[in-house]
Curated annotation (Swiss-Prot):
GO terms for biological process: response to hydroperoxide. Pfam families: H2O2_YaaD. One of its GO terms (cellular component) is cytosol. It comes from Bacteroides fragilis (strain ATCC 25285 / DSM 2151 / CCUG 4856 / JCM 11019 / LMG 10263 / NCTC 9343 / Onslow / VPI 2553 / EN-2). This is UPF0246 protein BF3795. NCBIfam families: PRK02101.2-5. InterPro entries: YaaA. Belongs to the UPF0246 family.
Amino acid sequence: MLILLSCAKTMSDVSKTKTPLTTFPGFRKEAAEVALQMSQFSVEELERLLKVNPKIAVENYRRYQAFHSEGTRELPALLAYTGIVFKRVHPQDFSEEDFCYAQDHLRLTSFCYGLLRPLDMIRPYRLEGDVRLPEPGNRTMFDYWKPILTDRFIADIKKAGGVLCNLASDEMRGLFDWKRVEKEVRVITPEFHVWKNGKLATVVVYTKMSRGEMTRYILKNRIESVEQLKTFAWEGFEFNEQLSDETKYVFTNGKTE
């Protein structure tokens, strides 16, 4: 089973956690070109393109200016992203065996680096999928990466057993030819809902936390089959057989009213 997670907007370049090995990103040349083009934008342009406040725009202007410098600090991707999902994965207590297993069974999307393994060394950046780069062809990041990533992604899923546990946000499908992915491998997309006033509701923070907890559960317990995936339970979330189907696994918290 291969897990797919979305990258986070927040990143760090400092960690005390040691990993058994580090690797180069598979698309580091493309990432370098993306970062080079991003470095041509002014602070004001980054503020508009990234939809951020001036402080964050300045921070990322500096990041892109330093991206190609030898002294710029790097971290393994799984430690570099610091959003809610990654806090719940909590790789800080992973064993060497956990990291090695994750390297083969987890992939992270990235608008800058394309597709990452957990131990791929990356530099801090911020980028959105709808940003258009002048070269080549003024395309969005989705259009840029789709023809590059799809074959590699499918090959990685097949190598990991032919089943994808898609815990990424919906927009990340745009980085791949998703119809091809669904045609060539089995895709399971877990959903997490709470009952509120007798109806199912989606709470974003719970969804993010649950995605991280499920990723941790799969990696720590070496989950390989879709049946084993149904055993995931956390903070009242349990598999709901009635609401699920072959491609959508629904986990609900609480009871109907």
